[in-house]
């Protein structure tokens, strides 16, 4: 049986589909307490209200797959369309990920630092990449075999960025 951890699980749309496809969900997380309550009632008690930025690999059970529908508000036509932005934790500079000229290295354009966090909700994708990096460094047995991501159509221009990040982490991507 395939197992999965469900990040940014919301009310459980992706989780329900994964369950129906035969996956066993080990753990799910979302920031919104109402979404977590709905998930718990419809999918199961394996859900936890948490900020993904505060999770560490020690909090994540070993699973075959990680699924994540990271926030889309900054990409969606119904949202602010602010794009994916990062904030340097060394100097505080905020910058938009340049999907047209992306090469690995979200180095801060101001100080060159590579320590950053999401500055927009859609930048939370990079928190998954942080967790994968933590797994590789601290608990390689927790690296999932499969990554499943879903998002809105407006993510399209950023797909090469995601593909580059997946490749850097040792995964092939299909979109």
Q: Which residue ranges define each predicted feature?
A:
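Conserved active-site and SAM-binding loop architecture
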Residues: 1-175
């Amino acid at each position: 049986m395939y197992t999965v951890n469900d990040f940014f699980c919301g009310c459980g749309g992706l989780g329900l589909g994964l369950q129906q496809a035969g996956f066993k969900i080990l753990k799910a997380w979302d920031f919104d307490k109402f979404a977590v309550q709905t998930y718990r009632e419809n999918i199961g008690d394996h859900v936890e209200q948490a900020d993904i930025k505060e999770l560490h690999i020690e909090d994540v059970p070993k699973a075959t797959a990680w699924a994540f529908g990271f926030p889309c508000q900054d990409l969606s036509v119904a949202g602010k369309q602010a794009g994916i932005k990062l904030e340097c934790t060394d100097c505080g500079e905020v910058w938009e990920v340049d999907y047209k000229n992306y090469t690995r290295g979200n180095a801060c354009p101001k100080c060159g630092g590579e320590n950053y966090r999401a500055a927009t909700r859609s930048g939370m994708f990079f928190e998954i990449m942080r967790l994968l990096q933590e797994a590789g460094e601290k608990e390689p047995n927790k690296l999932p075999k499969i990554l499943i991501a879903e998002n809105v159509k407006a993510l399209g221009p950023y797909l090469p960025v995601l593909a580059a990040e997946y490749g850097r982490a040792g995964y092939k991507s299909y979109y």
